[in-house]
C-alpha cells in the first residue's frame, strides 16, 4: 500500500465519520484496583504459574472450559527488512475458524464497513507484504484504523478473556503508545497477550502501568505521533512467550520476537 493510496483511503473514511471526538477527552479513565480474579491482590498475574491467577495473596488454578479458544500455533516466516537484510521471525497467522473479513470484528474505535486500510500480512511471502517507497514499510503485523484526530479509543475485551486488561506501559514506542496485557483461555490453558495501541495523540488521563481497564474504558485518543499526517490507530496483538516477565523488560523488548510473538489480530478481537 503506497502512502498516497493509504492517505486517499483514510481521508474517505474519516470524511464519512460524523461523531465528534473532542468531547470525550476530559473523561476520566477507570483504573480499577482489582486483579484478574476481581479481588484486591498484592500479586500480579505475572507472578502466578501458567494456568493460575491471583486471588488475594494466593494463586488459584483456573480450570479449562469448553469455550476455550483453540491453541494458536506460531509459524516461522521471513522477509527483507528496511536495509535489505533477510530476517527470520515467528508469527501467529489467522486461525481457520476466525472470519477473514475485517468487518466481522469489533474495534476500539468507531468502525463500520471497510475501516481497516492496512491489515495483517506477516504470514505472507516476502514479496506480498506491505511495501512503501525504498522499503520504508516492511510487512505489517497489525491493523490500521484511520479516525479523526482526538477520537477516543475504548478498551475492548478480547475473545476468551479472563478478567480485565492490565496496563503495562504508557509512553513513546510507536509514537505515543499504550501496551496492555490480556489473559485468554486458549488450548486448555491461560495465555497472556499484549495489545499495542500506537500513534496516540495522548493516553487517557491518569493511565499508568499497574492500572486495569474494563470494557469501554478510555485507553487514549487517536493521533499521528510517530506517523505525521497519517492520523490512525495502529492496533497490534502479540502473544507473550511462556516464562517471560514483562516487569523486567523495557517497552521495546516487550515486543521483540524473543519475548512475544506477533499475532493476526483477528484471532483475538471480539466478533460483532
Language model features by range: what are they?
Residues 148-150, 183-185, 225, 238-242:
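Solvent-exposed coil/turn segments that connect beta secondary-structure elements
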Residues 178-180, 213-228:
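Short hydrophobic beta/alpha edge segments that flank linear recognition/processing sites
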Residues 36, 40-176, 185, 215, ...:
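Surface-exposed, glycine-biased beta-strand/turn segments
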Residues 143-145, 198, 215, 220-221, ...:
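Active-site scaffold segments
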Residues 156, 160-206, 231-232, 236:
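Zn2+-dependent peptidoglycan hydrolase active-site motif and core
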Residues 2-23:
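Sec-dependent N-terminal signal peptides
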Residues 63, 73, 82, 190-193, ...:
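Acidic, glycine-rich catalytic/binding loops that coordinate metals and/or anionic ligands
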Residues 19-34:
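Signal peptide processing junction and immediate N-terminal pro/mature segment
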Amino acid at each position: 500500500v503506497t502512502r498516497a493510496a493509504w492517505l486517499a483511503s483514510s481521508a474517505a473514511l474519516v470524511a464519512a465519520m460524523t461523531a465528534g471526538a473532542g468531547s470525550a477527552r476530559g473523561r476520566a479513565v477507570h483504573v480499577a484496583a482489582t486483579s484478574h480474579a476481581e479481588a484486591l491482590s498484592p500479586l500480579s498475574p505475572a507472578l502466578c504459574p501458567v494456568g493460575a491467577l491471583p486471588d488475594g495473596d494466593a494463586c488459584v488454578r483456573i480450570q479449562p472450559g469448553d469455550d476455550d479458544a483453540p491453541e494458536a500455533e506460531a509459524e516461522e516466516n521471513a522477509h527483507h527488512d528496511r536495509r535489505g537484510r533477510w530476517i527470520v521471525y515467528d508469527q501467529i497467522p489467522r486461525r481457520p475458524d476466525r472470519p477473514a473479513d475485517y468487518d466481522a470484528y469489533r474495534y476500539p474505535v468507531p468502525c463500520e464497513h471497510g475501516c481497516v486500510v492496512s491489515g495483517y500480512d506477516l504470514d505472507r511471502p516476502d514479496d506480498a507484504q506491505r511495501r512503501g517507497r525504498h522499503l520504508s514499510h516492511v510487512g505489517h503485523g497489525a491493523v490500521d484504523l484511520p479516525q479523526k484526530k482526538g477520537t477516543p479509543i475504548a478498551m475492548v475485551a478480547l475473545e476468551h478473556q479472563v478478567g480485565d486488561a492490565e496496563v503495562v506501559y504508557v509512553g513513546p514506542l510507536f509514537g505515543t503508545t499504550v501496551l496492555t496485557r490480556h489473559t485468554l483461555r486458549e488450548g486448555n490453558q491461560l495465555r497472556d497477550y499484549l495489545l499495542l495501541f500506537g500513534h496516540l495523540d495522548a493516553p487517557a488521563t491518569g493511565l499508568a502501568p499497574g492500572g486495569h481497564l474494563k470494557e469501554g474504558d478510555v485507553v487514549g485518543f487517536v493521533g499521528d505521533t510517530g506517523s505525521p499526517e497519517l492520523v490512525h490507530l495502529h492496533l497490534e496483538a502479540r502473544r507473550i512467550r511462556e516464562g517471560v516477565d514483562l516487569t523486567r523488560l523495557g517497552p521495546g523488548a516487550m515486543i521483540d520476537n524473543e519475548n512475544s510473538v506477533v499475532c493476526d489480530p483477528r484471532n483475538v478481537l471480539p466478533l460483532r
